[in-house]
Amino acid sequence: MAKRGYRSKKKQWTTLILIDSQAVKNTCNAGVDSKGFCAYKSTNGIKRHLAVDTLGFPFFTHCTKANISDDRGLIEMLTKHIDYFRGKPMNVPKITILVDHGYHPKTLTAALEKIYPAIMHKIRFEQSAKPSRAEKDAQGKSGFVVVKARWVIERSNSWMERCKSLMKNCERTLDHATTKLNLCFIRLMLKRLAHK
């Protein structure tokens, strides 16, 4: 118990944030403002954008219509929380933002520099390496292979799916959907604290 508590201590400024998005279907109760169609996932609903630390707990959360691209959703999320990056001193290491291949670092950099010109002195984008077929064969693996560090955010997505109220989007507004997402993680973190 003590070891786990010690390991969980985090520094004030993180050095790694993992990003992912998840398309979720709407129910008939969902409002018009939260309806969009994601052609890639063939989902009519919303998209949850999540930024987590190395323990899988959220740094930032944001919900958009499902037809919003991953890049645009991430830009909106980071813009909403730009004060975190403004307050970060220049003398601490850059934050690595690890994204998958659905994101385009050049597009993200150009958009964020318009909002906060000094941001790229404080963060850097990195796409997680996807193992090639030759690498899989060399390791004797086939099909789905866990990508280093990416499993953390995939686990966070599965934590969300364990909340019954998040299986589908029932909320009338995107703000309510984001709040429901935050409540899910607050509940999870409180349970962890209670067991220490």
Where are the regions a protein language model picked out?
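Helix-centered, glycine/charged polyanion-binding patches within enzymatic domains
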Residues: 86-175
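Charged phosphate-binding loop/patch that engages nucleotide di/tri-phosphates or the phosphate backbone
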Residues: 180-196
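Helix-centric, low-specificity signal for extended rod-like, repetitive segments
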Residues: 18, 41, 141-143, 148, ...
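Catalytic-loop motifs flanking and including active-site residues across diverse enzymes
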Residues: 70-73, 152, 179-182
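Polybasic low-complexity intrinsically disordered regions
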Residues: 1-115, 128-130, 185
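Tryptophan-centered motif/residue detector
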Residues: 22, 58-59, 151, 159, ...
